[in-house]
């Protein structure tokens, strides 16, 4: 089965065409500057990238260009669009309504729209992409895969906030978690790689990218995760603050004469390691500044690693033990000095880091020593493949 995977943002769109049987990526690319001037990047497997500058007033024109590229006689991945069997859409927030991938009927889309206020930056864009695909491919099944779905197994003690219960009843204010597709994929891949029985395992997944989160996966199900109602809670991230004393919002608002939107902009876009360091949200830049002795870059890296280690420790307690810790995503897969810093706090678990294997980038590898009491590994994530494979079981 050929599955077109779509990840739609407000002015951009990423796509991959994947064969679910072979798990081969047939073609991939992105559309940028939708609504401005438009740019399509297309790459068939084994060929060079093709870049086309063309107007994309809306997502519909962008997706039409993707479809045209996919069955282009010269470099297309399919001879005819009828060879695309299904479209898998990433949807950021499914609230409490969706615990698994679902076919996108009108009834389902209405429920997704109800979740827009929980993810105002993401869900509306996801819906625009879905509608555009429906218009252009009316006979192809559309499936929604939700970032929040994997975390719906969290118990009430993990997802309820210490707020008046009426806010949960009226507005569904609770912890939802994100990166669920990645956490699900990596926990399964980790168990398979280490030959663990997923249904009898305790795995902690550290998805460390510009957005970052940790999850506790007990017997294949998520029992806790670091993000909350929104992706702002939890770890210190690229530009997001993560956990803070809520009273800071009032304090900063008064000092800086900001309204609530202004404060939220600071917490979401001007904080994290970029705000701490004054250098960058990119750990390649941070590592260079760290090695040059930049004190603020050193602070940023130390704070980031310390927060991750604290969450890992918390989830060891939540599961009463741990069999494996898996690092994934951009930083988790590629930044060895951050992994080393995080693991340095975990000696009490009997973890010993193998500094040689810890130098790996972007490949499956055990980075703990053979006599380490807990196995630590790097497991590359593949959210597009995970979305593709989730369609098979519907």
Regions found by a protein language model. Give the residues of each.
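Phosphate/pyrophosphate-binding loops at sites that engage ATP/ADP/AMP, CoA/4′-phosphopantetheine
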Residues: 69-84, 190-197, 312-323
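Adenine-nucleotide phosphate-binding core of ATP-dependent small-molecule kinases
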Residues: 265, 272-276, 283-318
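Short glycine-rich, Thr/Ser-proximal phosphate-binding strand/loop in the N-terminal lobe
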Residues: 3, 12-56, 228
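Glycine-rich beta-strand-to-loop/alpha-helix junction loops that act as flexible
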Residues: 9, 89-92, 208, 326-334
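Short beta-strand-loop/turn "lid" adjacent to the catalytic site in phosphate-handling enzymes
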Residues: 70, 74-122, 143, 149-158
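Conserved small/polar residues in nucleotide/adenosyl-binding loops
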Residues: 392-394
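Glycine-rich phosphate-binding loop of actin/hexokinase-like ATP-binding domains
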Residues: 150-253
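Glycine-rich phosphate-binding loops at beta-strand->alpha-helix junctions
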Residues: 323-346
